[in-house]
């Protein structure tokens, strides 16, 4: 009745302890859409999750208002929360959507 996502924590004796950058081979990028960035950051911090800096907000271009910040899962996986409070810029020119956060 909806999407499902599994994230695993693996261990091994020869495990590297440095997580890959998003731009590295084998890197990853997983983002979660949030309606309220401040509330989402507070939720993560209240749970003891390390938020990597302050949220970044675009103030011009077609991405005006887009806000994002990375955080670290307890097992070292870098994840992101993102918000588009004014929608995405391309949406003004077409009825097509890349994705819809309601689903």
Regions found by a protein language model. Give the residues of each.
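Amide-forming acyltransferase catalytic core, primarily the GNAT-like/NAT-type
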Residues: 13-14
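Short, structured active-site "lid" loops
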Residues: 1
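Eukaryotic phosphotyrosine signaling hubs
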Residues: 27-28
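Vicinal oxygen chelate
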Residues: 5, 32, 38-103
């Amino acid at each position: 009745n909806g999407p499902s996502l599994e994230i695993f924590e693996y261990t091994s004796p020869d495990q590297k302890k440095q997580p890959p950058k998003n731009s590295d081979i084998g890197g990853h990028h997983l983002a979660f859409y949030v309606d309220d960035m401040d509330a989402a950051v507070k939720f993560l911090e209240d749970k003891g999750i390390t938020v990597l800096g302050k949220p970044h907000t675009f103030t011009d271009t077609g991405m005006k208002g887009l806000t994002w910040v990375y955080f670290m899962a307890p097992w070292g996986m870098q994840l992101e929360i993102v918000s588009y409070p004014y929608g995405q810029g391309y949406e003004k020119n077409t009825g097509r959507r890349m994705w819809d956060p309601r689903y």
